[in-house]
Amino acid sequence: MAKPNPEEFFDLGVKSIEAKDYIQAKKYFEKACDLKYGGGCGNLGVLYQNGQGVEKDLTKAAYFYSKACDLKEGLGCFNLGALYYNGKGVEKDLIKAAYFYSKACDLKEGMGCGNLGVLYYNGDGVKRDSKKADQYFSKACKLGNQEACEALKEK
């Protein structure tokens, strides 16, 4: 008997989402997450954040994003940072938002770099530093974040 493949469960979950079968997607993502596949955990978080196939639950979304982030899934770190930034499902904490955006950026998630740049630009949760902001905008732009590219052009 072949060993369960978390990537296959993840791919089946994505196909289920494309078919708008969120209940089935949840089952596949749970299996992928149980097998320590960060994308599965992250997508479970998205289902809970959006209330797709499950009752909307931002606390559970934060839990699954945290699990995804621990498994080095950049988008999970980014999404967790966004929850902390907005105080959704967790207590608002700009320092934690900066931490998770930084972790996302380190994992080459362009949105994490871009949002970290905004925090440095505004001095939210970190000491205001326009030079660091530009460095993060530049990294985000190189990773395909168009908003960060625009922010650099405006300077």
Predicted feature residues:
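Short, charge-rich amphipathic alpha-helical segments embedded
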Residues: 30-43
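Alpha-helix N-cap/N′ positions at the starts of helices
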Residues: 4-8, 24, 99
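Terminal, low-structured helical/coil segments at or just beyond the last alpha-helical repeat
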Residues: 1-6, 139-155
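Hydrophobic face of amphipathic alpha-helices that form TPR/SEL1-like repeat modules
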Residues: 8-18, 41-50, 79-86, 115-122, ...
